[in-house]
Amino acid sequence: MAKKVQAYVKLQVAAGMANPSPPVGPALGQQGVNIMEFCKAFNAKTESIEKGLPIPVVITVYSDRSFTFVTKTPPAAVLLKKAAGIKSGSGVPNKDKVGKVTSAQVREIAETKAADMTGSDVEAMMRSIEGTAHSMGLVVEG
């Protein structure tokens, strides 16, 4: 018989840096999950990813307090900021441009995010990433 799902918990946790402090501890603690077990499993799964990069994770908590989790790719905005070498996007993206990214960088980000995005092809995903770049005040060259 299949386990009964008690809850889905969505978090963004830094790769390789999960620990029982907020936001992980309170979110999982109220579901009755063994927090250290999750932290060890998450850190082991994300050890190949650049340390500190925020990784979205969906944790499925079952009624017997066991859990499974699925990691996603980092948000497009984070990857764009890293590619452009900036700390944050523009507060007024239509007026103030804060950096530049090339089409090659946009393609690389689109290919990285391909598993999580619903676009039909790489070109459609690239347009989506370009839209995110424009809304952050980045100029796409090429």
Swiss-Prot record:
The keyword Transmembrane helix does not apply. One or more lysine residues are methylated. Keywords: Methylation, Ribonucleoprotein, Ribosomal protein, RNA-binding, rRNA-binding. Pfam families: Ribosomal_L11, Ribosomal_L11_N. Gene3D superfamilies: Ribosomal protein L11, C-terminal domain (1.10.10.250), Ribosomal protein L11/L12, N-terminal domain (3.30.1550.10). SUPFAM superfamilies: Ribosomal L11/L12e N-terminal domain, Ribosomal protein L11, C-terminal domain. GO terms for biological process: translation. One of its GO terms (cellular component) is cytosolic large ribosomal subunit. One of its GO terms (molecular function) is large ribosomal subunit rRNA binding. The keyword Protein biosynthesis does not apply. InterPro entries: Ribosomal_uL11, Ribosomal_uL11_bac-typ, Ribosomal_uL11_C, Ribosomal_uL11_C_sf, Ribosomal_uL11_CS, Ribosomal_uL11_N, Ribosomal_uL11_N_sf. CDD domains: Ribosomal_L11. Belongs to the universal ribosomal protein uL11 family. Forms part of the ribosomal stalk which helps the ribosome interact with GTP-bound translation factors. Part of the ribosomal stalk of the 50S ribosomal subunit. Interacts with L10 and the large rRNA to form the base of the stalk. L10 forms an elongated spine to which L12 dimers bind in a sequential fashion forming a multimeric L10(L12)X complex. This is Large ribosomal subunit protein uL11.
